[in-house]
Amino acid sequence: MDSLTDQVFYMNRYPTVGMVITSEGVVAIDGPMKPSDAIEWRDFIASKGPLRYHINTEHHQDHIASNWYLGGGTIISSEVTYSDFLTSLPSVEVAKERMLFYDPECGPLLDGYEIRWPDITFRRRMTLRLGGQTFHLIFSPGHTRGQTVVHAVEARVVFTADNITPGNYPFFHSAAVWEWFESLALLESLDVDWYVPGHGGPCRKDEIPRQRQRMFDVIGEVKKLKDLGLGREEVQERVNYIDRPGLEHPRVLGDRAYLLQKNGVGIVYDALGEHPSGQAG
């Protein structure tokens, strides 16, 4: 485990997860996908205090599979994340199969495993006050259409989930493409010292322009091919950015990373036919 302050801790696994200690218990943001990591994270949380709230920032399996392992604590997500839960974990069987792939020695840890859903949902914004700490949960579509960022005000840190991924290529397979840029602008406006991303280590505000540029690079490549008259499937086959030098992608995903990239290129292709302000009406 690593710390940013005496009250803020994070674990840079898959994904990067975080927690804030208050005088009345712990607020955790996401949890590790591997069962062995999730149990390690659970035990660390317990060493700091009771888990009071557990926030799911998105519906992707790497962020929600640990809900069952962490136990206790009220789980909170956006309404959209709640509605998309089964698109990532369609069944307990699929969840177990993927966890065994990512964590081959975890078999005994899967006994009794269940998909644990959020207990409370919110639409645009929610504020938690616990033990002298204030947490603003802000609906911030981007990497997924239901994304949440968590602004821990007094701790001067924001947990961005996959809206920021330092050193990693962006994935668009569940993205709200144009809203993602709006969410980055919101993150830039916050008065914080640290940004804890969904993948990679904590960063400063100067990471946000780099994230924005990485997204522009992918979108620009797709646009160039689309403008040449190439169809959606052809563009999906031709755009392969995650193997290029300079940045990383999650190797733990194996070949699935290429499927996610392909699906994301399709999402970008479709978004280029939309007006960023949305549909008229």
Question: Where are the regions that the model predicts?
Answer:
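Active-site HxH/HxHxD metal-binding segment of metal-dependent hydrolases
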Residues: 39, 43-123, 127, 220
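Metallo-beta-lactamase
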Residues: 26-27, 33-35, 127, 134-218, ...
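Short Pro/Gly-enriched beta-strand edge/turn motifs at strand-loop
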Residues: 1-5, 105-110, 129-134
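Divalent metal-coordination and catalytic microenvironments
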Residues: 7, 20, 30, 45, ...
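Conserved beta-strand hairpin/beta-sheet module of binuclear metal-dependent hydrolase folds
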Residues: 1-46, 149-161
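Short glycine/proline-enriched coil/turn segments at helix->beta-strand junctions
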Residues: 23-24, 47-50, 70-74, 154-155, ...
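Short loop/helix-cap segments at secondary-structure boundaries that form the rim of catalytic
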Residues: 21, 67-72, 130, 151
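C-terminal regulatory/interaction regions
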Residues: 228-281
